[in-house]
Amino acid sequence: MTAVGVQAQRPLGQRQPRRSFFESFIRTLIITCVALAVVLSSVSICDGHWLLAEDRLFGLWHFCTTTNQTICFRDLGQAHVPGLAVGMGLVRSVGALAVVAAIFGLEFLMVSQLCEDKHSQCKWVMGSILLLVSFVLSSGGLLGFVILLRNQVTLIGFTLMFWCEFTASFLLFLNAISGLHINSITHPWE
């Protein structure tokens, strides 16, 4: 039976209570900020140039030297940093999984708002939990990158793409916590 057919059979007296404007506005802001975090994280992972140290540019996907002319190597072993090739593979994988978890979390949040049924509260909670998982993966990738290149790291050496990933990770955390909090306020656990 279609959704229209189910609603047509529902008696008029059993209408679900409408959400307040404030609650809908907050949930919309959370969804919008998560979408921004997904875009920031995706661009940051795809570009991957995260650290400029002296005349070397370290990225998730390749390593470049910028002496007279820029020469890039896909073989990260050419950077002469122990464990960089294997470590960057792990950082890339964790970062990509963080983006995937954030996309699924965003999908759950949006579906819970578009299809208001008895399961929409569970969908909102699942979306928020997936955002927390995405935050953990994203911050783990950032931390792994910094640990791998700890000898080359300076605060001004981080590129815009690194700070995009950092901001995306922070936004994922804030929105996951906000999503769980607004859900606990509006729908107390039974």
Swiss-Prot record:
It is found in: Membrane. One of its GO terms (molecular function) is calcium channel activity. Pfam families: TMEM37. One of its GO terms (cellular component) is monoatomic ion channel complex. Belongs to the PMP-22/EMP/MP20 family. CACNG subfamily. Thought to stabilize the calcium channel in an inactivated (closed) state. Modulates calcium current when coexpressed with CACNA1G. This is Voltage-dependent calcium channel gamma-like subunit.
